[in-house]
Each structure stands twice: as structure tokens, then as C-alpha cells.
Amino acid sequence: MKKLQYIDRLTNQRVTESVCYEKTMTFLYSSKLGKRLSTLLSRSPILSRIYGWIQKRSWTRRKIPGFVKRNHINIKDFKKSLSEFSSFNDFFTRELLPEARPIAQGDNICVTPVDGAYLIYSNIAEFGEFVVKSKRFSLSKLLGDPRLVEKYASGSVVFARLALFDYHRFHFPVDCLPGPTRTINGYLFSVHPMALKDNFNIFCENKRTLTELKTEAFGDVLYLEVGALNVGSIIQTYKPGEKYSKGDEKGFFEIGGSTVIVLFQPGSVQFDADLLKNSRMGLETRCLMGQSLGRSLRE
């Protein structure tokens, strides 16, 4: 399997990503039998529910110390001690201390909404023409709403991929007034790069939720959470119609990998130069929640 590399934003160094369950992932996405099996698993919600149920059993706590050690997770960031987690899923949906993720300041600054690996595209229209294994990415399929497609078709898009070892709570990238969340039911294909290299439209096929954010600094912003392999549960903790500050929690994913997508209208945001540079090279940038994502272009 080709090693996945990304840029660590804190050090600006190229790093090889540690893949959880690497042998299993290689089998599922590099062999004919594995691909057939992964498709079966992704299309079966009952298997996802069973997996989720298992990870909520108390005996799964035994996996936590080894998982933390293998993935070099900083336990000093946690609100709870390792012994306080009731299950592996409880650990997976962990909360962090506020000081663990400082929020970039400035009314005209938007921030990264999750811990994860980021790809940034300033022009969705150009990205929409990208062909991945002869399959075009479709904004229309992703959003399922002609009004939203027209609104964001010439705007910008942020993809943030969360690995299994990441902190899995998602946050608002801007000061905003969020509307209600709309759910589009779908499958639970993996969003790991090994799966995306064959079909970027996985984002358009997976279960996902959409929330429109009203903002003063950036105009309207569209926020999507995309489920992935074994992630059937996207939990919203915010209240529609209440004002939130950037960095405030919006919700969390239950166990599995997942993705957050944020869309901006045309002429509303200038993304940070390092994120754009890395994305143009085809490299994800691994960021922590609350870091600067870009600045407003609106007066």
C-alpha cells in the first residue's frame, strides 16, 4: 500500500500518516474481494449498528490505553482521565479541555472546525470538473437541493477528513446563527484516501447532514457532516436559531472515520496561503480545531 503523506501544520513538515488497522484497510481497498466486502459492509446499516453497539460495551475500555499509545494521542488534552471512560465509544467521543484548542482571534477570521486533514479549493466550479477514476465530483448530488447548488456553485469548499485517532467533536468555524439540520440518508462508505482515489463521489453517496449558517462577516455558509464506515450516528448538540461563536461545539460523530465539508459563497473568503499551497500539491494539511482557516473578503 502506498504510504499516505500530509503536511503537519504545526511543524510544516511532511509526515507519513499512521493508518489504523492498516492490514485490514489494505485488504478492503487493494483487492477485488476486499472491495466487494467493503461495499457490502457500507451498504448494510444493521452491521454498522451492531459495530456501534459493541463499541459501547464496558469491556471495550480495555482497548483504550493501547490505542492511545499506538497513535501518540495527548491525554493531557482530555477532560476525563483514561480510567473514567465507560467504553471505547465514550473515549472516541471525548471532550477536550478548552485550553487544548485555542481559537484564532479576529472578527474577520474563520477557523478550522475539527481536528483533521484538510483539502481546500477556492473555486468549486473548477473542482467540479475534477475527474477521479472517470467519475466527476457532483455538487448537485452532494447537496440534493438546486437552490443550494446555485448559491454555492462558484464558491469555495473545505474538506476536513477525520481519522479514527482524531478528536471527533465538530465546531462552528464562524460566529453564526445556525438553522435546522437536514439529513440526507445514504450509505457508509469509508472516506479514507484509499477509498476516495477510486471514487470521490463517496461524499455524495454517504449519509450526511446539512446546516445553513447565517453570518455577518462571511455571508451564508453551508456546513455538512458526512458519515463514513461504521459512522451511522451524527449527533447535533447545538440549538437551531441560537447565536454561536466560532469554536463553539456543534456536535460529534460516534465511532468511525468521518468528514466535515464547509462551503462559502463566491468572494467571501481568502483561505490561508499554506493550506492552499499544500492542497494544490495534492497534500492534505493536518490541523487542529480552532486554527486560522482564512479571512473574510466582505466589507
Swiss-Prot record:
| GO function term, MF aspect, one | phosphatidylserine decarboxylase activity
Q: Which gene does this sequence derive from? A: psd
Which reaction equation describes what this protein catalyses?
a 1,2-diacyl-sn-glycero-3-phospho-L-serine + H(+) = a 1,2-diacyl-sn-glycero-3-phosphoethanolamine + CO2
Q: What is the protein name for this chain?
A: Phosphatidylserine decarboxylase proenzyme
Report the protein's function: Catalyzes the formation of phosphatidylethanolamine (PtdEtn) from phosphatidylserine (PtdSer).
Name the Enzyme Commission number(s) assigned to this protein: 4.1.1.65
* Site (Cleavage (non-hydrolytic)): residue numbering on this chain: 257-258
How the cofactor is bound: the record states: Binds 1 pyruvoyl group covalently per subunit.
* Any matching Pfam family: PS_Dcarbxylase
Question: Which biological process, per GO, is one annotated for this protein?
Answer: phosphatidylethanolamine biosynthetic process
Q: Which family does it belong to?
A: Belongs to the phosphatidylserine decarboxylase family. PSD-B subfamily. Prokaryotic type II sub-subfamily.
* Pathway(s) it belongs to: Phospholipid metabolism; phosphatidylethanolamine biosynthesis; phosphatidylethanolamine from CDP-diacylglycerol: step 2/2
Active-site residues annotated for this sequence? 115, 171, 258
Q: Which residues carry this modification: Pyruvic acid (Ser)?
A: 258
